[in-house]
Amino acid sequence: VGIIPGMKKLAARPEQFRLAISLHAPTAERRLAIMPIEKKYDLKAVLEAAAAFRKRITFEYVMIGGKNDSDQDADALAALAHKHGALVNLLPLHPGGAPGLEPTPSNKVKNFAGRLQARGVEAVVRRSRGLDIKAACGQLAGQTGSGAAGR
């Protein structure tokens, strides 16, 4: 996400930290449509704060069907990742993880990763875990009624 005051505190510490930024879109305008926090901590300022970290940063990028998975998105993400020397973790949106949104099909995720790699960006497609028991990232928050959520 990029909470800038927290990033600055971590960067000032003597320990070395690996920073992962929840990016989810390659431009500020596209990111705002997905992540309202862009209003408070805009992408430019987040990336400026990230420059203080001495270790390689990672961009976390949840693939949302029709929202951030076009060839143009891949090209813009590749340029951004290349500029900042970032690793890109691609994560398919979990079914039911966000109302009204659909995951990018797996073949399109692979093609997106290939497009990044062809442009010199290290991109990794992360495997979803916990889907079989409806406990993947973003799924537990939506649980209501009987089940684990009330415990």
Model-derived features: positions:
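Conserved AdoMet/S-adenosylmethionine-binding subsite of the radical SAM
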Residues: V1-V124
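Radical SAM enzyme core and accessory elements
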Residues: S128-R151
